[in-house]
Amino acid sequence: MTTAKRPLALLILDGWGYRENTHNNAIFHANTPVLDRLNAQYPHSLISGSGLDVGLPDGQMGNSEVGHINLGSGRVVYQELTRISKAIADHEFEQNPALCDAVDSAIKAGGAVHIMGLLSAGGVHSHEEHIEAMCRMAVARGATKVYLHAFLDGRDTPPRSAKTSLSHFDDLFTTLGHGRIASIIGRYFAMDRDNRWDRVSQAYDLITQGKSKFQYDNAVTALEAAYERNENDEFVSSSAITDADGQVATLQDGDALIFMNFRADRARQITRSFINPDFDGFERAVVPKMHFVTLTEYAGDIKAPIAYPSENLVNTLGEVLQKQGRTQLRISETEKYAHVTFFFNGGKEEPFEGEDRILINSPKVATYDLQPEMSSAELTDKLVAAIESTKYDVIICNYPNGDMVGHTGNFDAAVKACEAVDACIGRVVDALAKVGGECIITADHGNAEQMTDETTGQAHTAHTSELVPFVFVGRNATIDEGGKLSDVAPTILTLIGEAIPAEMTGKPLIHIKE
């Protein structure tokens, strides 16, 4: 006969932040007697779920994917943009082995260093600060032939904003004494992801042959001509930029080509056209034998050196529980099921041994303001049954309502969503009390606490950077202030009497009074 468990439940209230301003604050205006009572009776604080505290740029609002990765891994997991920017600031970037090898191989072969990527300050697929650091590093290591192939943005930036970036890089190369912009083309062509190979081929031919619709002696001139043709940045036609002698710079055998996009989805196709031996998306007139490097990992089947490989998160909470022979349950609705499983487990799809999963279908409605309670009652039925079974040591549950209804911008519906979740929490807490269990109530990021944009007066449908609640319903305890999401996993391990692995850099926030 199995021993009855006294479960510890982690209840993640998605999109549930704390905001001092009560105006258009659905969480404040909701009738939440259960949470009000728990906050009055039990220790609680606020923790951070945004910005640098979760591995995002300073001030950047949190999101569900990042939030659950931090919650489950017990460490701040730097997202690619932040990770690379931090490496540049710490002067680690210039020593990156994959990048150094590429530059050095080109220099040794008497070749050129070609740098391509989305020249943008948008920070979604790339960042021009990363491209600048690469140009500086190449010249610092002795490269005299450095060529930038600029893909222009206009989607994650204003439609006609590339002039500032192009002018900056012209000035940069003048300052460095080496290098120049060799070509420009809109991301519509270079960064297609829908197998429209006729678009990608134009970028490939531009870089490998200098084959272009237009040719200019200056990148800004080329851009201005594109605007005259009524082409915004995203759609700029292939334009080769010549040097003082009227020559174009093309990718040759022995050269290096470094792709500076950090987001994978729109980087895969053009990468495959450069490196796949059996590529058949379009006919390649030339296939240079060069040293190709990707900034991050684009896909498992793309065989090229990677400057910043994906971090393999070991000893996440789920893995530690498995190693210690503990049982665990992950439960949520469809909308957040991946978050309490795949993302909480650090990007691992398969369940750990001893990990059960329950998926509750989210309601089939056009938008969730039409059913703000979503499937919370059914979810709670299953959760209460799991608690009463005394089968699990740790239960991870996500209530999606605050986030999914918050995204609709419907204030009244968001209030109802919060009230539905509050009622569910009451049932969960009662069930835990009957079996001697405990729970932590927190959130992954804010949303429903701000339903109107104070500046424009329009609906605020995005996440926020507000702090999120952290409540411990259990033994007599104190809670440290100033916590963040990555402190939650170490806290759980401490509460169930397990050691915190070295990989977890978060700190336990709850201290039981003996």
UniProtKB/Swiss-Prot annotation:
Superkingdom in the source lineage: Bacteria
Keywords: Glycolysis, Isomerase, Manganese, Metal-binding
Gene Ontology MF annotations: manganese ion binding; phosphoglycerate mutase activity
Enzyme class label: isomerase
Signal peptide region: none
Cofactors (names): Mn(2+)
EC number(s) on file: 5.4.2.12
Catalytic activity from the UniProt record: (2R)-2-phosphoglycerate = (2R)-3-phosphoglycerate
CDD domains: iPGM (cd16010)
Pathway stated in the Swiss-Prot or TrEMBL entry: Carbohydrate degradation; glycolysis; pyruvate from D-glyceraldehyde 3-phosphate: step 3/5
GO process annotations (BP): glucose catabolic process; glycolytic process
Active site: S64 (phosphoserine intermediate)
GO CC term, one of those recorded: cytosol
Free-text comment on the cofactor: Binds 2 manganese ions per subunit.
Mitochondrion in keyword set: no
UniProt cross-references to InterPro entries, sorted A to Z: Alkaline_phosphatase_core_sf, BPG-indep_PGM_N, Metalloenzyme, PGAM_B_sf, Pgm_bpd_ind
Binding of Mn(2+) 2, residues: D14, S64, D444, H445
Pfam families the UniProt entry points to: iPGM_N, Metalloenzyme
Residues at which Mn(2+) 1 binds: D403, H407, H463
Residue numbers binding substrate: H125, R155, D156, R187, R193, R263, A264, D265, R266, K336
NCBIfam families named among the record's database cross-references: pgm_bpd_ind, PRK05434.1-5
Role according to the record: Catalyzes the interconversion of 2-phosphoglycerate and 3-phosphoglycerate.
Family according to the record: Belongs to the BPG-independent phosphoglycerate mutase family.
Subunit structure comment from the entry: Monomer.
Name of the protein described by the UniProt record: 2,3-bisphosphoglycerate-independent phosphoglycerate mutase
Organism in which the protein naturally occurs: Shewanella baltica (strain OS185)
